[in-house]
Amino acid sequence: MCGMSYRQRFEDRHAQAITEAIEQLRGRASAAKTWTEYAAMYPPPKLASETDVLQYAASLERGAAVADTKMVAKLHDPALRTLFARIGGVEAMHWALLRSTLGEPPIPDSFLPAD
């Protein structure tokens, strides 16, 4: 449980920083989704083992790292670009740690995937 609360703090801080950045630009952030809504958007496969859970978590972290990297390319505001680059770097580290835990090369390629 400690690992989940630790990870949740990261995600909460990321969401808070993004919300604050949007509000500083006089925008309005979308409402936070519940865990049930997220599960519906990213349904987990059958999680029958610890390996299944780690692989699913790794796929989510990879997806987050890729999404944040794509946001950097789309944004014009330097502060927002920096924010998404910093968050994406953390997500990539999470992905690498999960891959390493699975016995896979932590960094499988010279570049973060584009998809």
PLM regions: where:
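All-alpha RGS (Regulator of G-protein Signaling) helical domain and cognate RGS-like helical scaffolds
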Residues: 1-115
